[in-house]
Amino acid sequence: MDNSGKEAEAMALLAEAERKVKNSQSFFSGLFGGSSKIEEACEIYARAANMFKMAKNWSAAGNAFCQAAQLHLQLQSKHDAATCFVDAGNAFKKADPQEAINCLMRAIEIYTDMGRFTIAAKHHISIAEIYETELVDIEKAIAHYEQSADYYKGEESNSSANKCLLKVAGYAALLEQYQKAIDIYEQVGTNAMDSPLLKYSAKDYFFKAALCHFCIDMLNAKLAVQKYEELFPAFSDSRECKLMKKLLEAHEEQNVDSYTESVKEYDSISRLDQWLTTMLLRIKKTIQGDEEDLR
């Protein structure tokens, strides 16, 4: 069956679901189990939505899932309603990102009302990702990652909470909210130190915190590096700590060549990602005689 055939079938299912809803509101249905007709309508709306998905008509699929969700709410089937709102959100993602967010927020309201905070947290991440990639509103993405982290923390899912917080820190630093980023990197780094599995990553978090300090002020960065070495002696031997010390020295001497050379040397072994490149360029611009490139 081609897409137009699937769409025609979906439209027929929608009409059938609407008839069921209408019939459920009649006087006799009220006496003889109108709710079973509503249940049938829910099922038919979901079938129509899936048929629209097959036809790649994402908006129509989203709308049909929303209709099913509203009927589930009428029947007090909260869990089913939330599931349908999530399905609607996933369909709308492909056609109308803002509507996808609205549907996911409806699902989140239901899940939090039911005390299902882990699932609510997961959907806050989905919303954050839509703001990151589709709507490019980083402030709103940050807010949803923070909300997700809060819910995960409340449920003792600390590693999931930390993943969200690290996203917040990365974006906060790019938005020049350095203190916010520092607080998160230090908190996650300190927690990682105490875990045999995560210990190795602590140096990366302290390195990122030190770079944020450096963007505020060189003396800040110097004191931060000393603090991290005392707190986590393994940091002293890391390539990240050695790079920080070289960068501080180059900055103190206002030696842009030495700064660039140190970054190049580090990059030849550990490739710099976009975030590190941005931060290192910001610091480099504070050295006199700066050129625009790191390498």
UniProtKB/Swiss-Prot annotation:
Membrane-topology descriptor: Peripheral membrane protein
UniProt record similarity statement: Belongs to the SNAP family.
Example of a GO cellular component annotation carried by this entry: presynaptic active zone membrane
Record-annotated disulphide pairs: none
TM segment ranges: none
PANTHER family, per database record: ALPHA-SOLUBLE NSF ATTACHMENT PROTEIN, SOLUBLE NSF ATTACHMENT PROTEIN SNAP
Main subcellular localisation: membrane
An example Gene Ontology biological process: intra-Golgi vesicle-mediated transport
Residues the record lists as N-acetylmethionine modifications: 1
Record-given protein name: Alpha-soluble NSF attachment protein
